[in-house]
Curated annotation (Swiss-Prot):
Chief localization: cytoplasm
Species: Pyrococcus endeavori
Alphabetical list of NCBIfam families matching this protein: GdhA_Arch
Subcellular location: Cytoplasm
GO molecular-function terms, A-Z: glutamate dehydrogenase (NAD+) activity; glutamate dehydrogenase (NADP+) activity
The name this protein goes by in its record: Glutamate dehydrogenase
Family: Belongs to the Glu/Leu/Phe/Val dehydrogenases family.
GO biological process: glutamate catabolic process
Active site: 105
Pfam families per UniProt: ELFV_dehydrog, ELFV_dehydrog_N
A GO cellular component annotation in the UniProt record: cytoplasm
């Protein structure tokens, strides 16, 4: 796990970005603090008749650009510092994608594996009752995150509707819902699909002809890792030569079939020992000689210890925070093109935005329309960041921050919250 305080890291990253832009001291001070922090107590009746008390959080980091947006995490080690940091990062992510949102995040300190489905439902509904006064389709829009899913979002939306006594617009109170109650097509694949568009554009700026026959290694084979393997091989003709999960990885220089590997993982609990592939460690996967490396699992896997051994030409950060600041510098010096996490994995929040738009208007799009709109958003954001990096001769992560913070700062100036 990460040893540094997450919110301290978020503030340091903001301060670093501020060096590359003109921003007033007062605005920077404002941006280092969340606009609203809510801590709630949620009593839940357990199946055995006893009552357990849970602590929940909702942080609305900055709403200069619009309603705050961000997931709800259920985790036994959830902390307010983590929720604040993630809310700050959501602020920058929505800004770099130019979505009309601010950033938010929610969390409950709970081990969901120890709860029955009925207990989960009571906790979900209790959380919404507790934060009801600070959320709405026009104020703060939650979504699924760690250990929460479309079913939990459905219970939460239903509770919000019951309290508000409103129907259709209330669909937009939460995104990541099941399709039957206002979910969007394309949401499952959104993170990977968005990442694929940024990889496509990255190869253009590197002057590659196309991606056919190029190699990719993917660390992590959850939702994003699987969909990325499938999309890059089937739509772009890339060779997925290695994938891994928490138990280890597999390598086949001739390429792996995404669906067959997923089936094997579901049957055996891991991708390891997949027929026709060689078992490798997660550490070995990162250092393979491939064209594209996509860390899609956990944070801080590329550090100053192994950054010098990275041989990929593109590092696509599908996970949150997979590269440490020290490693950023090393990759930059080596001439490796990084697609930073706020940009690379922003397909998820972008399709969440599309879901909200469809809910508010009551008009639903086809899968092709969702993909086409996502492509436009991701491509524009990629060049906003890439051109800023080139212009200022800074690496992509710093450019990502500069683009995002500048947009939030401009909104704060226009509202009269701060001065130049």
């Amino acid at each position: 796990m990460v040893e540094q305080d997450p919110f301290e890291i978020a503030v340091k990253q903001l301060e670093r970005a501020a060096q590359y832009m003109k921003i007033s001291e007062e605005a920077l001070e404002f941006l280092k603090r969340p606009q609203r922090i809510v801590e709630v107590t949620i009593p839940v009746e357990m199946d055995d008749g006893t009552v357990k008390v849970f602590t929940g959080f909702r942080v609305q980091y900055n709403w200069a650009r619009g309603p705050t947006k961000g997931g709800i995490r259920w985790h036994p080690e959830e902390t307010l510092s983590t929720v604040k940091a993630l809310a700050a990062w959501m602020t920058w992510k929505t800004a770099v994608m130019d979505l009309p949102y601010g950033g938010g995040k929610g969390g409950i300190i709970v081990d969901p594996k120890k709860l029955s489905d009925r207990e989960k439902e009571r906790l979900a509904r209790g959380y919404i009752r507790a934060i009801y006064d600070v959320i709405s389709p026009y104020e703060d829009i939650p979504a699924p995150d760690v250990y929460t899913n479309p079913q939990i979002m459905a219970w939460m939306m239903d509770e919000y509707e019951a309290i508000s006594r409103r129907k259709t617009p209330a669909f937009g109170i939460i995104t990541g819902k099941p399709l039957s109650i206002g979910g969007s097509l394309g949401r499952n694949e959104a993170t990977a699909r968005g990442a694929s568009y940024t990889i496509r554009e990255a190869r253009k700026v590197l002057g590659w002809g196309d991606l056919k026959g190029k190699t990719i290694a993917i660390q992590g084979y959850g939702n994003a890792g699987y969909y990325l393997a499938k999309i890059m091989s089937e739509d772009y003709g890339m060779k997925v030569v290695a994938v891994s999960d928490s138990k280890g990885g597999i390598y086949n220089p001739d390429g792996l079939n995404a669906d067959e590997v997923l089936k094997w993982k579901q049957e055996h609990g891991s991708v390891k020992d997949f027929p026709g592939a060689t078992n490798i460690t997660n550490e070995e996967l990162l250092e393979l000689e491939v064209d594209v490396l996509a860390p899609a699992a956990i944070e801080e896997v590329i550090t100053k210890k192994n950054a010098d051994n990275i041989k990929a030409k593109i590092v696509a950060e599908v996970a949150n925070g997979p590269v440490t600041p020290e490693a950023d510098e090393i990759l930059f010096e080596k001439g490796i093109l990084q697609i930073p996490d706020f940009l690379c994995n922003a397909g998820g929040v972008t399709v969440s935005y599309f879901e909200w738009v469809q809910n508010i208007t009551g008009y639903y799009w086809t899968l092709e329309e969702v993909r086409e709109k996502l492509d436009k958003k991701m491509t524009k954001a990629f060049y906003d960041v890439y051109n800023t990096a080139k212009e200022k001769n800074i690496h992509m992560r710093d450019a990502d921050y500069v683009v995002a913070v500048q947009r939030v700062y401009q909104a704060m100036l226009d509202r009269g919250w701060v001065k130049h």
